[in-house]
């Protein structure tokens, strides 16, 4: 921070709960009737109300001012927590966040699906630090709801599409898997539909809803290659892998064998130092770094090796890219280089002119992030941000850069470049190739407008 940059500015957090529960229930009811026009209008109205939702934290910030003479009562008066004993150990056998952070939650998008069992919850990226997403805030994507499966009864079967591809088909118990040599690695997971609501135009107000189908964890498990070696897989004939889940949708996805041969694919049972959460596939899930989240099969019960892609339901009907000419692009699983500024971002309010730390996240499904550039004038000029350690392959990377806000409108953007040299595109560049009728793999540059009032809005530049 430069010595002449003036006082540090104050920032009001985004009103993550700007959608009232009653309104959410109403929108879901209308969704079941197929009234998509109502859904769009409802979310637009909610977005317009986000500014009003910011009034409460803004009022809170103003209600506890520092006296002009510098006599801050929070320093001069001894607080209750400094006068006696606090809570005892093991008040909670499993620690919980502070009650003052109760607003930091996963949240759903009303009307996105007709049932909450086949829906999404979004991670509060704007409220997180570093690169690791707490397991309790990890985004959710379910196709038939989540289950808490008894690990003592769960099995993983590995077989081939014929008797020659897998010499020794096997069934593993959880105990057998957890006795094998394990690895622990940090990776991001992103739903292919992340930012999908923004293809045509601005649709949602906050970072949580634009980019919140994204999380990053340390995953622990057995490399799938190890299990294949135990089963005698013929790598020359078996060039594709099918993962199958034990949930009600029996989710199945094809994974190219070269990803398994690289040693990156993990049959995981651990996440962030503990067992997987039920919402994340407990007791077993497939971890396929760099690939869209639908391929990270949860409740993993079977793996089959074959000589051709399987064309499963969610490959032949869903998770395809609609191209401008009317054709569908299939098996586009890799998540391209992408970034988003989390502070300042939509719904937040800058209360003062002065110094701010612009912070955000960058990632690439093709390797490490090499550089992130930041612009505050809509892309006319760029400065290179600091990449914070660690910078890992196919993992979130935190970036920061100093900024002195002069109180005038600013268009804040980030642009990531990965180690292959790929540069994150603008919406104009991406739409020239993909048009606006797609759902998946939107990795365009995100723009936040900091208004003269200090309020931050989601905008798109032509």
Language model features with spans:
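Compositionally biased regions
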Residues: 4-9, 61-64, 83
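N-terminal export signals
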Residues: 31, 37-65
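Terminal low-complexity, poorly structured segments
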Residues: 7, 15, 54, 72-74
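N-terminal secretory signal peptides
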Residues: 1-37
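Acidic/proline-rich low-complexity IDRs
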Residues: 10, 18, 57, 75-77, ...
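General helical structural elements
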Residues: 14, 29, 36-40, 44, ...
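Structured, non-membrane catalytic/scaffold regions adjacent to prosthetic-group chemistry
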Residues: 64-462
């Amino acid at each position: 921070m430069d010595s002449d940059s003036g006082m540090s500015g104050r920032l009001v957090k985004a009103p993550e709960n700007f959608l009232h529960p009653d309104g959410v229930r109403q929108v879901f009811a209308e969704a079941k009737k197929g009234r998509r026009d109502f859904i769009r209008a409802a979310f637009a109205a909610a977005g317009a109300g986000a500014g009003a939702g910011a009034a409460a934290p803004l009022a809170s910030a103003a209600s506890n001012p520092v006296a002009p003479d510098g006599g801050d009562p929070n320093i001069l008066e001894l607080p209750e927590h400094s006068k006696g004993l606090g809570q005892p150990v093991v008040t909670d056998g499993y620690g919980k966040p502070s009650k003052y952070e109760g607003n930091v939650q996963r949240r759903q998008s009303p009307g996105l699906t007709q049932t909450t069992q086949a829906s999404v919850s979004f991670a509060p990226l704007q409220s997180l630090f570093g690169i690791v997403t707490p397991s309790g805030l990890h985004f959710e994507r379910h196709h038939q709801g989540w289950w808490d499966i008894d690990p003592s009864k769960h099995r993983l079967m590995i077989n081939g599409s014929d008797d020659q591809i897998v010499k020794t088909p096997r069934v593993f118990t959880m105990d057998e898997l957890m006795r094998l040599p394990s690895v622990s690695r940090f990776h991001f997971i992103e739903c292919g539909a992340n930012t999908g609501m923004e293809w045509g135009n601005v649709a949602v107000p906050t970072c949580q809803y634009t980019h919140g189908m994204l999380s990053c964890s340390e995953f622990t498990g057995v490399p799938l290659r190890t299990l294949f070696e135990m089963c005698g897989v013929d790598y020359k004939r078996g060039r594709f892998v099918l993962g199958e889940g034990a949930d009600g949708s029996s989710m199945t996805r094809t994974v190219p064998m070269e990803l398994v041969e690289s040693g990156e694919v993990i049959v995981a049972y651990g996440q962030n130092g503990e067992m997987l959460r039920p919402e994340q596939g407990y007791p077993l899930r497939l971890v396929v770094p760099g690939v869209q989240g639908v391929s990270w099969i949860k409740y993993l019960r079977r793996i089959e090796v074959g000589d051709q892609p399987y064309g499963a339901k969610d490959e032949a009907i869903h998770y395809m890219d609609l191209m401008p000419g009317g054709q569908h692009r299939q098996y586009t699983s890799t998540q391209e280089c992408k970034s988003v500024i989390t502070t300042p971002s939509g719904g937040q309010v800058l209360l003062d002119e002065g110094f701010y730390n612009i912070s955000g996240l960058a990632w690439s499904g093709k390797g490490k992030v090499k550089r992130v550039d930041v612009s505050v004038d809509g892309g006319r000029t760029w400065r290179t941000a600091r990449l914070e350690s660690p910078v890992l392959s196919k993992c979130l990377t935190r970036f920061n850069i100093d900024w002195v806000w002069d109180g005038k409108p600013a268009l804040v953007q980030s642009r990531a470049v990965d180690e292959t040299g790929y540069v994150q595109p603008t919406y104009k560049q991406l739409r020239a190739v993909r048009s606006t009728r797609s759902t998946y793999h939107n990795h365009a540059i995100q723009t936040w407008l900091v208004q003269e009032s200090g309020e931050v809005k989601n905008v798109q530049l032509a």
